[in-house]
Amino acid sequence: MEKQYYEVDSNTGELVPTTDVVVVLHEGDQVRRKSQIEYCQRNLTARNDNGNFVWLLFKYGENLFPNISAANLTRLMYVATFCNKDGSIMGKTELRQKMNLNRTRWSEFWNEMTENKILYEQDGIVYVDSKFVVNGKIKTDCNYTRLFCEYIQQLYEGCSSANDHKQLSYIFKIIPYVNRRTNMVCLNPTEQDEHKVQTMRLGNFCDIIGYDKKHARRLANELLNIRINGELAIGFFVTNLDEKTWQLVVNPKLYFGGKYDLLFQKYRELFIKEAQEYKKLNETIQN
């Protein structure tokens, strides 16, 4: 006979049936539901999987750093991943070497960052303004997402030249339009119900990033060529041959603003499974 579990209704004080198992770890410990324990386990697994992160602060529906160039947006996201608890990045000379930019590109980058009061130098150390990037607890009321340091660094450092930085910027430009729970690119990024998310088509995406919709398929091909450890940075849901209608989802391994719940796990697995199939296909071709 299957066991029946009960919980106390907080409103009436009555015992009511529940499918959620209540677990007491040790006498005197806090009582935790099975679902709470499972959530904590998923949270820990996700943290171990994705690694360290910093918070990027922004406003949904508004362009991300509209006053800086596309290439410098990618460079800023890379720099942000080195943010320490006090907002420091590293020495200015060290940072330039780390970014692997020539003198002209470095000057353009630094001038844009300082003119827009994003980065500043103090005693030879570069700092990022806490209005934009935070390592630690967020104290302001704003929209935010996690930038996962290791994978954004791999993305940047994997570029064959600085000319690739503009292409990578498309991934970051859409942050204000990425749904917190699903990482789908959409028109209502704060929507919590997966089924009510109004997904954005590739044609709309082109408009936001300033890309000619006539060349939407070329953009799709460019994005599908961006991988991190074999995983796509951006995936597409395709229902017909008209590429302008394709829907986009960002790999949560790059950035993610929501909870590490079952929905997060679902979308992570989409990218993991695709990477496994991609690897098998390449092995078959090579053999």
Regions found by a protein language model. Give the residues of each.
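Short, amphipathic alpha-helical interaction segments positioned at domain boundaries
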Residues: 133-162, 252-284
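Short recognition helix of helix-turn-helix/winged-helix DNA-binding domains
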Residues: 1-90, 130-197
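Winged helix-turn-helix DNA-binding recognition segment
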Residues: 1-3, 66-69, 81-128, 183-244
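Gram-positive cell-envelope targeting signals
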Residues: 79, 247-248
